[in-house]
């Protein structure tokens, strides 16, 4: 195990660079909770964004990312700061211009209290994301548990 912060790189058979993410860094709820830097990871041109929001500083990733694994939703009908919805995720992808983008963080969890009224949140976010990307990036939508060949 290696503790890392933004900008740190470790070699574990491949080079893993910790890159900033824009999300609440608390590790437990409530006042006095430990707060750490929220992170994403860049591994040989593949960027796992982690839980993040849009930030113009992401432009530093432009030209470094071949494949982006980008969150396009969360778990409910609205998302607060620190999260990307389909339009926000498309904005990030248009900013950094990877060759391929794979929408993640969707389709796996719908709290019981939301019921059938919000079932579209299990299926629509990656399609909305793909429609919102305006650049040349190829969007590959894969169902949860699926595989992407690079």
What residue spans do the PLM features occupy?
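Divalent metal-coordination and catalytic microenvironments
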Residues: 16, 51, 68, 101, ...
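Flexible loop residues that form catalytic
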Residues: 21, 73, 106
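Core dinuclear metal-dependent hydrolase active-site scaffold
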Residues: 3-63, 81, 131, 143-150
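Metallo-beta-lactamase
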Residues: 43-50, 66-67, 72-73, 80, ...
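A generic short-segment signal for beta-strand/edge and adjacent turn/coil regions
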Residues: 10-11, 41, 70-72, 108-112
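General N-terminal targeting signals
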Residues: 28, 33, 64-65, 85, ...
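Binuclear metal-ion centers of metallo-dependent hydrolases, dominated by the metallo-beta-lactamase
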Residues: 1-8, 76-78, 86-150
């Amino acid at each position: 195990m290696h503790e890392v912060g933004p900008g740190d790189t470790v070699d574990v058979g491949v080079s893993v660079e910790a890159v900033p993410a824009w999300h609440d860094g608390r590790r437990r709820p409530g006042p006095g909770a430990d707060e750490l830097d929220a992170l994403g990871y860049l591994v040989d041109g593949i960027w796992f964004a982690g839980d993040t929001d849009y930030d113009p500083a992401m432009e530093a990733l432009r030209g470094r990312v071949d494949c982006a694994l980008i969150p396009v939703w969360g778990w409910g009908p609205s998302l607060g700061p620190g999260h990307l919805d389909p339009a926000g995720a498309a904005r990030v992808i248009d900013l950094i211009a990877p060759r391929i983008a794979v929408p993640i963080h969707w389709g796996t969890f719908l709290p019981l209290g939301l019921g059938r009224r919000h079932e579209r949140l299990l299926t629509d976010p990656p399609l909305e994301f793909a429609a919102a990307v305006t650049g040349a990036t190829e969007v590959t939508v894969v169902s949860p548990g699926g595989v992407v060949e690079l």
